[in-house]
Amino acid sequence: MSEKLPYKVADISLAAWGRKALDLAENEMPGLMRMREMYSASKPLKGARIAGCLHMTVETAVLIETLVALGAEVRWSSCNIFSTQDHAAAAIAKAGIPVYAWKGETDEEYLWCIEQTLYFKDGPLNMILDDGGDLTNLVHTKYPELLSGIRGISEETTTGVHNLYKMKANGILKVPAINVNDSVTKSKFDNLYGCRESLIDGIKRATDVMIAGKVAVVAGYGDVGKGCAQALRGFGARVIITEIDPINALQAAMEGYEVTTMDEACQEGNIFVTTTGCIDIILGRHFEQMKDDAIVCNIGHFDVEIDVKWLNENAVEKVNIKPQVDRYLLKNGHRIILLAEGRLVNLGCAMGHPSFVMSNSFTNQVLAQIELWTHPDKYPVGVHFLPKKLDEAVAEAHLGKLNVKLTKLTEKQAQYLGMSREGPFKPDHYRY
């Protein structure tokens, strides 16, 4: 396949700004810097041709340059049409790394961008780094001839992991995969603490709304929902949760949140956030009962949670306030403010998670790529986890930056607990 464009970004002149942002982020990403210190000399990813499909942000740029420092060739696209930070994409392009991403892609351009990452100068991809499963699905359905040459997939997010397990159950998955999302240092940090900061950032930048005193409805009380609920409560909102899982619902109730259905909550809320990864969470009948100027947004991976199609087909008027902020006038006279067209609000309307928490997630990604590339015999076709020892190592790499001092087990204590002084400190089934 002939290579057409070395990169495609919004504006290559933003590269200098992007480079400054990368320099700042590196100081907040100790895990990735540790990976460079440990592996830059040995280059364990030498020979790997990694196709990446993950939000093209400043933090992702630091991940990309880490993979390259470890010996990999990389081609990149974003996993969301609104999530690219154009200065970050420009910096990566300027560094000579093929990247195909800009903020505000069409669905057709989005697919085109992913397809540009499949073929390298020395041959097709042989590793996948995915976020949400679009790249994984594309190769399995449209380019199955490439599957035999792919050594492994590392998947970043809950939605993509769900997709992998579904593929495996249906006998469709043809490549070994590591579930990065369920590393403790990913899901209990990125999903929880990342969303706790970036949700509010997105809502504030989009609307400048006062959150204190408002009623906020959070659909879903997984790790993402927990972070969102904490953030909204911290800013003074009264928070209502909707849930399908009795365990999560009980957790929410015991944290003091009201738990009810969307059919009831839609009449009370001023701000709505979907976090479920499921379809049909907020539908036409809910919009029709909402208060005037209710703010509706999503922080789950895909744009399937909010019925945006219903709004577009049934609203009397749609007014674009500014990029990714639309105000719909309904037939009943009430208005709905929709953020980021129902896609990820924290990346569509703000800058996504802070660098420090993304360092946790991306260090897991680097370790997963090294594992799959250097130990292919250990990972048959299926969905695997990183070992507990590596999870603990990711956490340990971030402690110094926060001036955390760990207590060290004595030999006597270690013998009493029946474990090594060096860990792992918890069994695999421990839930944290």
Curated annotation (Swiss-Prot):
A Pfam family hit: AdoHcyase_NAD
InterPro entries linked: Adenosylhomocyst_ase-like_sf, Adenosylhomocysteinase-like, Ado_hCys_hydrolase_NAD-bd, NAD(P)-bd_dom_sf, S-Ado-L-homoCys_hydrolase_CS
GO biological process, one term: one-carbon metabolic process
Catalytic reaction equation(s): S-adenosyl-L-homocysteine + H2O = L-homocysteine + adenosine
Residues holding substrate: 57, 131, 156, 186, 190
Subcellular location field: Cytoplasm; Melanosome; Nucleus; Endoplasmic reticulum
GO molecular function, a single term: adenosylhomocysteinase activity
Keyword Transcription regulation belongs to the record: no
Cofactor binding description: Binds 1 NAD(+) per subunit.
Subunit structure: Homotetramer. Interaction with AHCYL1.
Coiled coil: none
Residue numbers carrying Phosphotyrosine: 193
Gene that produces this protein: AHCY
Protein name: Adenosylhomocysteinase
Residues bearing the modification N-acetylserine: 2
N6-(2-hydroxyisobutyryl)lysine modified-residue sites: 186
Family to which this protein belongs: Belongs to the adenosylhomocysteinase family.
Stretches for region NAD binding: 183-350
HAMAP family (UniProt xref): AdoHcyase
UniProt xrefs under SUPFAM superfamilies: Formate/glycerate dehydrogenase catalytic domain-like, NAD(P)-binding Rossmann-fold domains
Annotated keywords: Acetylation, Copper, Cytoplasm, Endoplasmic reticulum, Hydrolase, Hydroxylation, NAD, Nucleus, One-carbon metabolism, Phosphoprotein
Cofactor(s) needed: NAD(+)
Residue numbers of Phosphoserine PTMs: 183
EC number: 3.13.2.1
The organism's place on the tree of life at top rank: Eukaryota
Function: Catalyzes the hydrolysis of S-adenosyl-L-homocysteine to form adenosine and homocysteine. Binds copper ions.
Coarse class of the protein's main subcellular location: cytoplasm
